[in-house]
């Protein structure tokens, strides 16, 4: 089944962040990835524990950035992966990595990660100065590895079906989840768009 994943960005949220997280969790995305580049480690862990408590209530898997000593479901950047050995991490960890090239995707799979996020695919306000890598790049990534590939970058209800057509296993969405009026209605719209021919 094609997965819809929420990636957080506190800066985009115009209401209490944890209130927004609860609304998103109640809408049942396939996963929430807690991303916050604007806080220190201590603040991140405190927020992460609160978010994990919310996601557990709604039975939504939640990935945290790194902090392998605390969390078992983690996401990391490629530079982070290159500085650790996954075999040294508890085998119970579920690990995802963000990649920006086919070579990185292959390397991540060889190092034993469970999934990758590839991007950015379409133009996005999050990376205004970087050209999108496009659908052909995403298709090449999907054809190069066997683990799940999730796309990210500028994805919405109007283009998510193009992501499906590349063979990707899911889509990660940030601004849509952070700014929509109703996460329940928003995710329903996305799931409907996924199945359109």
Role assignments for model-derived ranges:
Residues 11-25, 67-68, 100-107, 156-161:
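Short, acidic/polar
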Residues 73-80, 96-143:
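Glycine/Thr-rich beta-alpha phosphate-binding loop at enzyme active sites
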Residues 24-27, 111, 144, 165-167:
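Structural motif
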Residues 3-8, 32-34, 62-64, 72-77, ...:
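Hydrophobic faces of well-ordered beta-strands that scaffold small-molecule active sites
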Residues 6, 74, 78-88, 117-129, ...:
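Glycine-rich phosphate-binding active-site loops on the catalytic face of alpha/beta enzymes
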Residues 31-89:
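N-terminal active-site wall of soluble small-molecule enzyme domains
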Residues 47-66, 87-101, 129-157, 190-197:
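Alpha-helix-loop-beta-strand connector modules within alpha/beta enzyme cores
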């Amino acid at each position: 089944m094609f997965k819809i994943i929420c990636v957080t960005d506190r800066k985009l949220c115009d209401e209490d962040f944890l209130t927004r997280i609860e609304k998103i969790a109640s809408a049942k995305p396939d996963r929430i990835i807690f991303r916050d580049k604007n806080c220190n480690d201590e603040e991140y862990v405190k927020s992460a524990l609160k978010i994990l408590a919310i996601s557990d209530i709604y039975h939504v898997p939640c990935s945290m950035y790194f902090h392998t000593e605390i969390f078992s479901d983690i996401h990391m950047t490629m530079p982070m992966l290159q500085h650790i050995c996954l075999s040294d991490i508890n085998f119970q960890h579920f690990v995802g990595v963000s990649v920006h090239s086919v070579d990185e995707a292959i390397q991540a799979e060889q190092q034993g990660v469970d999934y990758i996020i590839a991007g950015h695919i379409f133009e996005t306000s999050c990376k205004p100065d970087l050209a999108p890598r496009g659908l052909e790049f995403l298709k090449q990534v999907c054809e190069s590895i066997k683990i799940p590939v999730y796309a990210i970058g500028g994805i919405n209800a109007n283009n998510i079906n193009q992501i499906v057509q590349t063979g990707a296993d899911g889509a990660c969405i940030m601004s849509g989840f952070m700014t929509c009026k109703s996460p329940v209605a928003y995710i329903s719209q996305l799931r409907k768009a996924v199945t359109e021919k």
